[in-house]
């Protein structure tokens, strides 16, 4: 046990961890029954969170309230600071909602009373919490055991982001969790204490519906959604009481000036409304008649069945979707039990429910009136079904007696009985029981007498939240912001009758399409303009809706007013996702707000068709979205061929060219998700020139590291002709091999000129190439790659082994840049420098993928093996390494995009000529850009759970910058090289010094602070001096 003042804790009793601390469950050393929560903050992190810690301690000491977590003690040890706080044994509201799904209005009122009481004292002291969310609202049971709602005490916790805000002042710091942030906070505008009211509104909405009102894939998407939509209207269920609906609409106002103030919140009628006191259900005499073959235990243990687990629900859903219809639903069928056991059912746990007995034979069913619209499930989930043994009642021979105060409702039910007497019966012959919620307008109830266990046919289909029978709105996950509400035809159906049918028939039978009037389908959903990336996802969701329903097939009118997407698992993950030739996919490519670095491969589209958007602002939005070219074709074709099908200018001629090029070129599969049609070089040659990157050439399609590409033989050329290439000079070094030898071999000629289109990138030194290529075209050998095996270099002046066949004399020619203007050469030099810099940055990402030593040090620190703490720290280390990788990849992508935009602007202005060197460097920049985007997407997918669970890391992540990482890596590289030099290990010292100098030089070009630039420049100069000293010593030796 670890001792902290008068308290102690065990490191195995981990409660949770946040951005700056780990929380353990502890106890008082003398009063062992006094449980506390001990927050341990490592002093290594204290420098970053010291201000937050001081504010939290000060605020907690000042706030003494039963609905605010109490602070008992603060202890400072050599390595840590401990806060001893009140322990809440009920977990947090997020766990409670995870277990319950949704809450009833009465339960919400009980919780909201306590939240308002805590907010009243915060408001009186001028404190804003700034991070109100279900995870920071704790639950405490008074008697240490789970009881009903009245025994739950709400506690507001985690005041790390809280601050004092005096009257008539505004704050502008980004704090909190994005889904619960007020729009003015997430948009980095000035805000006041009303930001907490928005957070309370989102929490209430989640308690009522099961999800926050406005969601998105990322904080950036949510911010864009708030910026686009000036007025927000949350989708409030129709069965919500007017007071609660008014409260939600008042709290969830986008403009803080229109938002409800604290005084109106504290005195709102919903909080002041006195809930109707619930009495025990009155037994209703029923029709007599035996139920054959019924048997059920009467033990109380089987009366209330617990909700099925997730695997069970998945199995149930599969059975329900594949099972045939079981006939028309039997609504509110009453069992043939007696009323003698009514006292057993009047438990306090049934506060929010009306238990309906099996009193009516299976051939009777009726609809509930609209006045008795059922409401959401609350405390417990009760299900009873099957066949129960009837008990003789003394009133069994009499007609049903109306329940007191419900004569009119009972008369209407009796009329419905008569009108629906001819409806079909249950094929299984067993009456069904159901659990129906009371509504505000009609607290009518029937007594469910006896008990029975659920049968498979009676199991309610759920998906993510609990569905009590009678819930007027099925669960479906919240749509992504910006998506288009679809109209369902198989999941929803509307009834024009005045009554709302409540079916809990778990059959998956489809509903005829004509049963869904469009006027009801649009309902009160929030409709917003779709983002371009969501169009493709919605197309996939529309394909799956008819075969993947998420709600019972016989839905009432309450189901049809709020169409929503299906379940989260189907958002954008349809196996049918492919790159097709539909106009919608093409529109996605040509209308995407992301920077289209390279234009269309055809000359009909103007090159450099790049939207004028800032690349840095789109990077995070890009990596969190899925492009339609995500999956590659299964037949092994390169995505670049498929991408041509997406082009608007696609034609049969284009397809035939693709087939020919596919047969000639051995093309590699692109790792990027951007279409190669967008990535083809737009820096085309001069108008009328055939030497353009818009044409298929070996330089454009050869993968890095691959051997040269051989062109097909033209008709009439002998395949066995020997080709000889004469150039002047010495053979090039392997490190400076030509990047292109796209040369058309000619027959024997004495011409000294060059007709090569690739000569500009060849080495200035001449050489003689002798070989027997399969055709008259020589392929290209990229840097570092070996040439074709049939070629060999012969020094100038020596006789070639054979002069038979074709001979070409290739004179050395000057690079194109020699004759260019200085602006051209400076821009090209800058592009090459940024290319080398980003390649060094990409090399750094390989070593940032997680620190395995951290886990080992944690084991030695805690002296325990395989503990929860070590596992969590190890996983946290891996995720943090991925965060650093993501930051570096995003920075590299930003720099590459900026370089490509610079090249585009310079070409348009005529300062940069589209020479071969320019085209090659642009091609390399674009390939690296695609690679960075692909890696960003993969890392974002891996970190989705990390970001969602660690919302408190958002400020810490903002402090992780690529510039700091690059600088630290350069310093470590120089230090390790100097250490190796001291120990005479000089294999790659010069290489590491050069790489560090290159990183610092690139860093000096992107830093903004002049002081930082000056320091980096001094460090780089010292590295260069050391390099010159090494060169001098090497020359001397």
Curated annotation (Swiss-Prot):
The keyword Glycoprotein does not apply. Gene3D superfamilies: Phosphorylase Kinase, domain 1, Transferase(Phosphotransferase) domain 1. One of its GO terms (molecular function) is protein serine/threonine kinase activity. Residues 813-1037 are annotated as: CTD-like region. Residues 335-348 have a biased composition (Low complexity). Autophosphorylated. In response to nutrient limitation, probably phosphorylated and activated by AMPK, leading to activate autophagy. It catalyses: L-seryl-[protein] + ATP = O-phospho-L-seryl-[protein] + ADP + H(+); L-threonyl-[protein] + ATP = O-phospho-L-threonyl-[protein] + ADP + H(+). Widely expressed. The modification Phosphoserine is found at residues 430, 772, 781. GO terms for biological process: autophagy; axon extension; axon guidance; collateral sprouting; negative regulation of collateral sprouting; protein localization; regulation of autophagy; response to starvation. Keywords: ATP-binding, Autophagy, Cytoplasmic vesicle, Kinase, Membrane, Neurogenesis, Nucleotide-binding, Phosphoprotein, Serine/threonine-protein kinase, Transferase. The active site is at residue 131. It comes from the Eukaryota. SMART domains: S_TKc (SM00220). Residues 319-350, 452-480, 494-515, 540-594, 626-697 are annotated as: Disordered. Residues 9-271 form the Protein kinase domain. Its EC number is 2.7.11.1. ATP binds at residues 15-23, 39. Serine/threonine-protein kinase involved in autophagy in response to starvation. Acts upstream of phosphatidylinositol 3-kinase PIK3C3 to regulate the formation of autophagophores, the precursors of autophagosomes. Part of regulatory feedback loops in autophagy: acts both as a downstream effector and a negative regulator of mammalian target of rapamycin complex 1 (mTORC1) via interaction with RPTOR. Activated via phosphorylation by AMPK, also acts as a negative regulator of AMPK through phosphorylation of the AMPK subunits PRKAA1, PRKAB2 and PRKAG1. This is Serine/threonine-protein kinase ULK2.
């Amino acid at each position: 046990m670890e001792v902290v003042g008068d308290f102690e804790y065990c490191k195995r009793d981990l409660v949770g961890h946040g951005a700056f601390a780990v929380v353990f469950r502890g106890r008082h050393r003398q009063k062992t029954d006094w449980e506390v929560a001990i927050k341990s903050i490592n002093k290594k992190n204290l420098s970053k969170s010291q201000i937050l810690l001081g504010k939290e301690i000060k605020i907690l000491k000042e706030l003494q309230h039963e609905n605010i977590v109490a602070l008992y003690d603060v202890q400072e040890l050599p390595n840590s600071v401990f806060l001893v706080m009140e322990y809440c044994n009920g977990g947090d509201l997020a766990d409670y909602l995870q277990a319950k799904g949704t809450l009833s209005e009465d339960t919400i009122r009980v919780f909201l009373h306590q939240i308002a009481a805590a907010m009243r004292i915060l408001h009186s002291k001028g404190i804003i919490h700034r991070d109100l969310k279900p995870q920071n609202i704790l639950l405490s049971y008074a008697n240490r055991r789970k009881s009903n709602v009245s025994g739950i005490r709400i506690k507001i916790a985690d005041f790390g982001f809280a601050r004092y805000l005096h009257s008539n002042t505004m704050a502008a710091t980004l704090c909190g969790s994005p889904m619960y942030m007020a729009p003015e906070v997430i948009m980095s505008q000035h805000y006041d204490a009303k930001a907490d009211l928005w957070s309370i509104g989102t929490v209430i909405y989640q308690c009522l519906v099961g999800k926050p009102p406005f969601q998105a894939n990322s904080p950036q998407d949510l911010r864009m959604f708030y910026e686009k939509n000036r007025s927000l209207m949350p989708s409030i269920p129709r069965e919500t009481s007017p007071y609660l609906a008014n409260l939600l609409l008042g709290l969830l106002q986008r403009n803080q000036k229109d938002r409800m103030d604290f005084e109106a919140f504290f005195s709102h009628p919903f909080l002041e409304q006195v809930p109707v006191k619930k009495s025990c259900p009155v037994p209703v005499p029923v029709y007599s008649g035996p139920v054959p073959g019924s048997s059920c235990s009467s033990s109380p243990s089987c009366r209330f069945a617990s909700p099925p687990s997730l695997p069970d629900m998945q199995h149930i859903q599969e059975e329900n979707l594949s099972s045939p219809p079981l006939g028309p639903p039997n609504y509110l069928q009453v069992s043939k039990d007696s009323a003698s056991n009514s006292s057993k059912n009047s438990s306090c746990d049934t506060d929010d429910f009306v238990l309906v007995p099996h009193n009516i034979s299976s051939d009777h069913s009726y609809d509930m009136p609209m006045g008795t619209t059922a409401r959401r499930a609350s405390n417990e989930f009760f299900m009873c079904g099957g066949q129960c043994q009837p008990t003789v009642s003394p009133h069994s021979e009499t007609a049903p007696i109306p329940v007191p105060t419900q004569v009119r409702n009972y008369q209407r039910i009796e009329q419905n009985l008569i009108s629906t007497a001819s409806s079909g019966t249950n094929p299984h012959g067993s009456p069904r029981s159901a659990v129906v919620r009371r509504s505000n307008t009609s607290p009518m109830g029937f007594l469910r007498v006896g008990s029975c266990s659920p049968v498979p046919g009676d199991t309610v289909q759920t998906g993510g939240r609990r569905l009590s029978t009678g819930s007027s709105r099925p669960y479906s996950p919240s749509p992504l912001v910006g998506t288009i509400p679809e109209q369902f035809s198989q999941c929803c159906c509307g009834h024009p009758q005045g009554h709302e049918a409540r079916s809990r028939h778990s059959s998956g039978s489809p509903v005829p399409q004509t049963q869904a009037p469009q006027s009801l389908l649009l309902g009160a959903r929030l409709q917003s303009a779709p983002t371009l990336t969501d169009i493709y996802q919605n197309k996939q969701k529309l394909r799956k809706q008819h075969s993947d329903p998420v709600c019972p097939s016989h839905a009432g009118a309450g189901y049809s007013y709020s169409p929503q997407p299906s379940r989260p698992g189907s958002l954008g993950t349809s196996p049918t996702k492919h790159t097709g030739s539909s106009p919608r996919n093409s529109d996605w490519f040509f209308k995407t707000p992301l920077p289209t670095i390279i234009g269309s491969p055809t000359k009909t589209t103007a090159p450099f068709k790049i939207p004028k958007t800032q690349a840095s602002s789109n990077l995070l939005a890009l990596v969190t979205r899925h492009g339609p070219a995500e999956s590659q074709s299964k037949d092994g074709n390169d995505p670049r061929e498929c991408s041509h099908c997406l082009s608007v200018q696609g034609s049969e001629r284009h397809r035939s060219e693709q087939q020919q090029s596919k047969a000639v070129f051995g093309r590699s599969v692109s790792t990027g998700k951007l279409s190669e049609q967008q990535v083809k070089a737009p820096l085309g040659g001069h108008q009328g020139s055939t030497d353009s990157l818009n044409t298929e050439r070996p330089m454009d399609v050869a993968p890095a590291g691959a051997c040269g590409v051989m062109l097909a033989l033209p008709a009439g050329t002998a395949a066995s002709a020997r080709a000889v290439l004469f150039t002047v000079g010495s053979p090039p070094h392997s490190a400076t091999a030509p990047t292109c030898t796209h040369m058309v071999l000619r027959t024997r000629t004495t011409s000294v000129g060059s007709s090569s289109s690739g000569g500009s990138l060849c080495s200035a030194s001449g050489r003689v190439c002798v070989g027997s290529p399969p055709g008259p075209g020589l392929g290209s050998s990229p840097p570092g790659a070996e040439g074709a095996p049939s070629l060999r270099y012969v020094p100038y002046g020596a006789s070639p082994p054979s002069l038979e066949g074709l001979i070409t004399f290739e004179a050395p020619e000057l690079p194109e840049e020699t004759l260019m203007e200085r602006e051209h050469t400076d821009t090209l030099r800058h592009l090459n420098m940024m290319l080398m810099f980003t390649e060094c940055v990409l090399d750094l990402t390989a070593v940032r993928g997680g620190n395995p030593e951290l886990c080992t040090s944690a084991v030695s620190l805690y002296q325990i093996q395989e503990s929860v703490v070590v596992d969590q720290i190890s996983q946290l280390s891996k995720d943090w390494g991925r965060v650093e990788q993501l930051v570096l990849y995003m920075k590299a992508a930003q720099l590459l995009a900026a370089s490509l935009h610079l090249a585009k602007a310079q070409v348009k202005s005529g300062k940069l000529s589209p020479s071969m060197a320019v085209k090659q460097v642009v091609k390399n920049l674009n390939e690296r850009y695609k690679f960075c985007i692909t890696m960003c997407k993969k890392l974002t997918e891996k970190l989705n759970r990390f970001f969602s669970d660690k919302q408190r890391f958002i400020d810490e992540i903002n402090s992780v910058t690529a510039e700091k990482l690059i600088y630290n890596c350069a310093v470590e590289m120089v230090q390790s090289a100097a250490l190796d030099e001291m120990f005479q290990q000089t294999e790659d010292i010069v290489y590491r010094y050069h790489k560090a100098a290159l990183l610092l030089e690139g860093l000096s070009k992107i830093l903004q602070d002049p002081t930082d630039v000056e320091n980096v420049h001094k460090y780089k100069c010292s590295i260069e001096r050391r390099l010159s000293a090494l060169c001098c010593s090497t020359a001397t030796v």
